[in-house]
């Protein structure tokens, strides 16, 4: 399936981006994202690491839900070192547990006996079906030569992402549609940063865990008012229809967000105060749509920002208290640590001293530890900084489709727990089950729509294998597309 992003920031960050986009939609100048606006090397800019000052120290790290290969070279060495030196690694969810995958899939489905056609307005359903047919036709041209070279084929890829879409709840269909874009399709095949960290933690025999349950992440979306879900799905379709017609460029893309992450400047697009209510005077939404958007905002703030960050912060505190002699590494979407009402605020209220750790700053050590020599640090990081084409292509296992995954993996778990390799990816978008897909060709691994390819051994030698760590669309103006853009931010940053 598919942190700083998908991102993979808090719900508060998501909402702030939404409102900024809606208020300033007409001010954006679409185009290619530029590099960091500074002469400082990019590798020295990106620090989403915070240190919990105690003995021994623990760490908070902000992830982004994009392929790890897009951001890993820009992550500072001290962030990687913090991961290496931590004995316990916690994520939002159990990222490699097959039961997590199954639960995430089940939570997307409509009640037994219901199909999407039964619950959507007829006109909206037909528009959705038309758009998915368009995506199916376009997929072959969207795929990269590298993907085709690995053996992926378009029909299988479509079924892996959108299979069984008529059984999904509308809110999950909205997220699915938002991920069925050319830019997103081109990223399929490489684990997102969160999953890669989880797999590395398992490989390094670290203790792992989660601070949230699947139900806690699913329930707020599934209980969103139905009329508001229809509003959001309609806006998402309007945006995609406008892009198809050539009348709209998405003003803020995944590429822009990756640039902000790699430059370490997410604060440039995220307000510091989650309590601020933007001025809507410049918004071109109709008054009724503004009311709906504000209702969604109020719901998200209550259920998905404050409650979630408070709950996560309390559980981090409990873990620190229960195991005071262990070094923790908490890897959550970066926005959980940004702005007010964050996880960091909860920890500080509980009496913990939490400080941002810039790139290049030495890590705090246990009492009595000597300062690290650079040569010693490099040697200590070698097990963590490995990276080969062979390892990259073997990160995900399992050819079974979603309905087979749970049964087979659990059966294997009972037979031999040590032989099990479990999968996970993007928490919100790339969790689609694909029960309509036929058996894939050998060495192509799919779990809930997130695809990783394992090539044959003779294909492992490549020149770049040595990377480190080793409606009508005419109704859609810039402001009308803002909600759909916000969904993009949601899946990448939360």
UniProtKB/Swiss-Prot annotation:
Cofactor(s) recorded in Swiss-Prot or TrEMBL: Mn(2+); Co(2+)
Ranges annotated as spanning the membrane: 468-488
Range of residues in the leader sequence: 1-25
GO MF term list: metal ion binding; metalloendopeptidase activity; Wnt-protein binding
Cytoplasmic compartment segments: 489-494
One example of a Gene Ontology biological process annotation: negative regulation of Wnt signaling pathway
Cofactor note: Divalent metal cations. Mn(2+) or Co(2+).
CDD domains in the cross-refs: Tiki (cd14789)
Topological category with respect to the lipid bilayer: Single-pass type I membrane protein
Entry EC no(s): 3.4.-.-
Main location group: membrane
Keywords associated with the record: Cell membrane, Glycoprotein, Hydrolase, Membrane, Metal-binding, Metalloprotease, Protease, Signal, Transmembrane, Transmembrane helix, Wnt signaling pathway
Record bears the keyword Protease: yes
Glycosylation sites: 234, 282
Positions on the Extracellular side per record topology: 26-467
Localization in the cell: Cell membrane
UniProt enzyme class: hydrolase
Assigned GO CC terms: membrane; organelle membrane; plasma membrane
Protein family (similarity comment): Belongs to the TIKI family.
Its biological purpose: Metalloprotease that acts as a negative regulator of the Wnt signaling pathway by mediating the cleavage of the N-terminal residues of a subset of Wnt proteins. Following cleavage, Wnt proteins become oxidized and form large disulfide-bond oligomers, leading to their inactivation.
Protein name: Metalloprotease TIKI1
Organism: Danio rerio
Gene symbol of the encoding locus: trabd2a
């Amino acid at each position: 399936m598919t942190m700083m992003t998908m991102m993979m920031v808090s719900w508060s960050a998501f909402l702030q981006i939404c409102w900024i986009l809606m208020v300033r939609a007409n001010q954006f100048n679409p185009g290619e994202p530029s590099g960091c606006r500074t002469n400082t090397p990019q590798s020295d800019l990106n620090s989403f690491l915070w240190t919990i000052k105690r003995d021994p120290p623990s760490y908070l790290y902000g992830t982004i839900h994009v392929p790890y290969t897009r951001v890993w070279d820009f992550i500072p060495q001290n962030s990687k070192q913090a991961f290496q030196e931590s004995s316990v690694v916690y994520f939002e969810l159990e990222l490699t547990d097959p039961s997590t995958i199954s639960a995430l899939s089940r939570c997307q489905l409509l009640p037994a006996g219901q199909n999407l056609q039964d619950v959507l307005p007829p006109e909206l359903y037909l528009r959705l079906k038309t758009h998915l047919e368009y995506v199916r036709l376009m997929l072959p041209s969207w795929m990269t030569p590298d993907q085709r070279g690995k053996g992926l084929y378009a029909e299988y890829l479509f079924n892996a992402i959108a299979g069984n879409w008529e059984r999904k709840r509308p809110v999950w269909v909205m997220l699915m549609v938002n991920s069925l874009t050319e830019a997103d399709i081109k990223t399929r095949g490489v684990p997102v940063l969160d999953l890669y960290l989880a797999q590395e933690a398992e490989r390094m025999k670290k203790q792992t865990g989660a601070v949230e349950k699947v139900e806690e992440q699913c329930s707020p979306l599934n209980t969103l008012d139905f009329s508001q879900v229809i509003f959001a799905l309609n806006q998402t379709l309007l945006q995609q229809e406008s892009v198809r017609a050539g009348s709209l460029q998405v003003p803020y893309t995944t590429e822009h967000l990756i640039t902000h992450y790699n430059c370490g400047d997410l604060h440039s697009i995220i307000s510091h105060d989650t309590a601020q209510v933007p001025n809507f005077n410049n918004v071109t939404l109709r008054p009724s749509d503004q009311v709906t958007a504000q209702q969604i905002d109020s719901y998200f703030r209550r259920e998905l920002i404050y409650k979630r960050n408070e709950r996560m912060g309390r559980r981090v505190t409990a873990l620190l208290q229960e195991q005071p002699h262990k070094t923790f590494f908490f890897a959550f979407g970066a926005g959980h640590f940004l702005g007010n009402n964050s996880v960091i605020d909860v920890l500080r209220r509980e009496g913990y001293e939490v400080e941002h750790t810039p790139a290049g700053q030495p890590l705090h050590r246990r009492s009595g530890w000597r300062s690290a020599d650079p040569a010693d640090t490099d040697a200590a990081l070698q097990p963590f900084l490995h990276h080969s084409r062979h390892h990259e292509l073997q990160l995900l296992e399992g050819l079974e489709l979603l309905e087979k995954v749970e049964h087979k993996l659990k059966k294997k778990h009972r037979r031999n727990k040590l032989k099990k390799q479990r999968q996970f990816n993007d928490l919100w978008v790339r969790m689609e089950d694909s029960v309509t897909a036929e058996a894939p060709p050998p060495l192509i691994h799919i779990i809930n729509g997130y695809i990783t390819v394992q090539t044959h051994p003779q294909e492992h030698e490549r020149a770049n294998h040595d990377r480190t760590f080793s409606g009508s669309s005419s109704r859609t103006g810039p402001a009308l597309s803002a909600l759909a853009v916000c969904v993009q931010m949601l899946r990448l940053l939360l």
